[in-house]
Regions:
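A polyanion-binding, active-site-adjacent surface
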Residues: 2-213
């Protein structure tokens, strides 16, 4: 994955932000390559985002690491025992996930957080491989509507689906391969600041997921 060159626009953007950097990260050496998933290969739970953050995963080389969305997510994961640490700051911070794997559908940060359909299609094979390699997987939590929509789109490519899937926080959908999909509001700073998602809502959803694993 980290050697992928399928999407020239995304490669250019990753290189650009790795050179220009953000003021508070000016001394950091940016990863600047596609970002793979990470976690327990025997995971029963998959947490799926859309794409790595420009100055989060693209900087640190790990999904939901080094950005505010990750800060919120890992505080919640730690509180219910899924993560051994309450934060995710860099690839060698000693973080361990319990029966959980975290990835993004798109492996590179898109400009303005708006990926093209071609770019999403280019990445779908990587997601396919992740799903196949996680042989004990039972539940997928999709963070945000776009990640949810692309997960459904992926399944529609591979299975005949008649059910209508609508993004609703905390809903439970049975997928045709026996897995369960649960939509969740994305823990973005905007959603957290406007109380669309808060610690209580996230913990409640995660506790529900733990019961069905």
């Amino acid at each position: 994955i980290i050697k992928c060159k399928k999407c020239p626009r995304l490669i250019r953007f990753s290189k650009k932000i790795s050179i220009t950097k953000r003021k508070q990260n000016i001394l950091d050496v940016y990863w600047g390559k596609p970002v793979t998933g990470f976690g327990d290969i025997n995971a029963k739970l998959l947490i799926l985002g859309l794409a790595p953050a420009a100055h989060g995963g693209t900087r640190t080389g790990r999904a939901f690491t080094g950005d505010k969305s990750g800060d919120f997510l890992f505080r919640c994961l730690h509180k219910i025992g899924i993560s051994n640490l309450p934060s995710s700051t860099h690839r060698k911070d000693g973080l361990i996930l319990n029966s959980t794997y975290i990835t993004n559908f798109l492996k590179c940060a898109p400009p303005s957080d708006k990926p093209l359909n071609l770019e999403l299609n280019n990445c779908s094979n990587y997601f396919d491989n992740e799903i196949k390699n996680l042989t004990k997987l039972k539940v997928i939590i999709s963070l945000g509507k776009i990640a949810f929509d692309n997960c459904i789109k992926f399944y529609k490519k591979n299975f005949i689906i008649k059910e209508k899937f609508i993004f609703k926080h905390g809903a439970k959908y049975n997928l045709p391969d026996g897995k369960i999909l649960i939509p969740c509001y994305h823990p973005s700073p905007r959603n957290v600041n406007t109380k669309v998602i808060d610690t209580q809502k996230m913990i409640k959803l995660l506790k529900f997921v733990k019961k069905i694993l």
